[in-house]
């Protein structure tokens, strides 16, 4: 005799769902839809990256031979190859250390349009390294398999960082490459390869001085040899052009840069650089604009770096700029803990990795990224790509924690970060937000958040790893 499972309906009873449809068949479309939704969630980072790079190709390539990369960097590289002076006081001047021109020299051998396409591909790789490396530093799972709360963390990080991640691609600058070198160096530190990390960080410092902040940071953590290697790499890369392409008369490219541009920092009021003062979103630019006009109520006329300032005003700007800079450095050092302490172990991250000090290195690097922008003599929005790291740190903490301070900071960050895009606000209001220093306040807000996220005190877990921490607690 055939038997039916207990509590099952009779064979001849009408179906419980639609006519002619079994219960299993009714759930198949829902299951398929759930699988498709889960697939999109897991692959959302890859889809976002593909859309971003396709969308940014046109703004990057549209100016062709008139782009900033060609007019500034390739021109400097070709002058270097011809053993000419590369640091000149001219429109679209090359105002960076000579190492950047040397590294652009291979592309200077190509036609301008071809070099620009290759440079975009380099920036695509560098942007991928920045995002994936920062995500890894802060303990995120593989970006190809996002699920659960990590989907929300990723998209909140994208919302906060998108404006500043796209800015260097709009201007064809080196900032994404510098940020990639910084992230690569921090990843080496995370894995215990201190000297390798110092080499990557030194290469970044060779192209822009602000990454030199990592040298005293390494010394603070007791890595004196790594700090020396970082400074040595930065110096050697900037001296190589003098050996391979010496100028007639024995002049030094590095000396030319110091005399032409770096010396202006000492002669002028803080915030004055070879660009519009409104574009300078460093701390010195904010103080300089405030000293001239306070908070302007309209888009014009805006404060200018060419304004004749009285000696008293210049002294006031220097006092506030340098005093605030020292205060930010002191507070950051206090949050880092006592000098000489090793990195604390963070246990396993979302990948199952148990590298020592992973989250602490990521958070401390995020704080240094904010300081790099705030303490620099000149920081434009293109330089702000390094804030990808603190943006991800904030996004993860906001999603995972019930922290009232982070809840208060989020609308402030949204107002001063993503909403500064002139595509959203228009040129007049966009210029006004720059005059108010919205990006500067954005970096300050992120620095406050990172200070709050850093551990309050040294734990028993040391750089030897989680096992040592467990042994210490057992003892």
Regions found by a protein language model. Give the residues of each.
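Start-transfer (signal-anchor) and selected internal transmembrane alpha helices
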Residues: 1-7, 12-56, 144-152, 446-475
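Primarily membrane-embedded glycan-assembly and transfer machineries that use lipid-linked glycans
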Residues: 27-195, 221-349, 353-365, 370-381
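Hydrophobic transmembrane alpha-helices
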Residues: 111, 126, 208-211, 390
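Small-residue hotspots
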Residues: 185, 197, 204, 410-411
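Membrane-interface alpha helices of multi-pass inner-membrane proteins
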Residues: 195-219, 368-375
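Central hydrophobic cores of alpha-helical transmembrane segments
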Residues: 202, 230-235, 365-370, 406-417
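Hydrophobic/aromatic-rich transmembrane helices and adjacent perimembrane loops
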Residues: 380-395
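Aromatic-enriched
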Residues: 393-470, 474-475
């Amino acid at each position: 005799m055939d038997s039916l499972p207990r509590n099952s309906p009779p064979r001849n009873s009408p179906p419980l769902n639609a006519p002619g449809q079994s219960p299993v068949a009714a759930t198949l479309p829902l299951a398929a839809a759930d699988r498709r939704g889960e697939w999109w969630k897991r692959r959302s980072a890859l889809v976002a990256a593909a859309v971003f790079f396709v969308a940014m190709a046109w703004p990057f390539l549209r100016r062709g031979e008139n782009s900033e990369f060609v007019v500034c960097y390739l021109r400097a590289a070709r002058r270097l190859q011809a053993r000419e002076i590369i640091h000149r006081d001219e429109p679209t001047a090359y105002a960076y250390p000579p190492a950047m021109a040397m590294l652009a020299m291979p592309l200077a051998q190509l036609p301008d349009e071809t070099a620009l396409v290759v440079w975009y591909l380099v920036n695509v790789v560098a942007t991928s390294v920045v995002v994936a490396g920062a995500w890894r530093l802060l303990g995120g799972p593989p970006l190809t398999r996002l699920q659960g709360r990590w989907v929300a963390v990723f998209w909140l990080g994208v919302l906060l960082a998108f404006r500043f991640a796209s800015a260097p691609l709009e201007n064809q600058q080196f900032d994404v490459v510098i940020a990639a070198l910084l992230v690569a160096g921090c990843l080496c530190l995370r894995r215990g390869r201190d000297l390798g990390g110092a080499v990557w960080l030194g290469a970044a410092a060779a192209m822009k001085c602000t990454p030199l902040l990592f040298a005293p940071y390494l010394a603070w953590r007791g890595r004196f040899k790594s700090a020396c290697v970082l400074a040595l790499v930065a110096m050697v890369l900037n001296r190589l052009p003098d050996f391979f392409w010496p100028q007639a008369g024995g002049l030094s490219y590095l000396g030319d840069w110091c005399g032409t541009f770096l010396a202006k920092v000492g002669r002028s009021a803080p915030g004055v650089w070879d660009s519009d003062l409104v574009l300078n979103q460093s701390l010195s630019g904010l103080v300089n604009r405030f000293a001239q006009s306070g908070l302007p109520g309209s888009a014009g006329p805006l404060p200018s770096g060419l304004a004749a300032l009285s000696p008293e005003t210049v002294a006031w700007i220097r006092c506030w700029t340098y005093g605030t800079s020292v205060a930010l450095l002191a507070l950051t050092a206090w949050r880092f803990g006592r000098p000489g302490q090793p990195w604390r172990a963070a246990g396993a991250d979302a990948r199952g990795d148990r590298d020592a000090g992973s989250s602490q290195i990521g958070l401390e690097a995020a704080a240094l990224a904010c300081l790099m922008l705030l303490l620099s003599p000149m920081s434009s929005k293109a330089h702000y790509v390094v804030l990808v790291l603190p943006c991800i740190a904030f996004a993860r903490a906001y999603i995972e924690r019930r922290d009232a301070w982070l809840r208060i900071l989020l609308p402030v960050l949204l107002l001063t970060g993503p909403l500064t895009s002139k595509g959203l606000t228009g040129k007049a209001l966009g210029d006004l937000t720059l005059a108010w220093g919205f990006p500067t306040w954005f970096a300050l807000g992120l620095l406050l958040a990172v200070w709050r996220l850093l551990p309050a005190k040294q734990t028993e877990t040391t750089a030897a790893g989680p096992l040592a921490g467990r042994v210490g607690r057992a003892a």
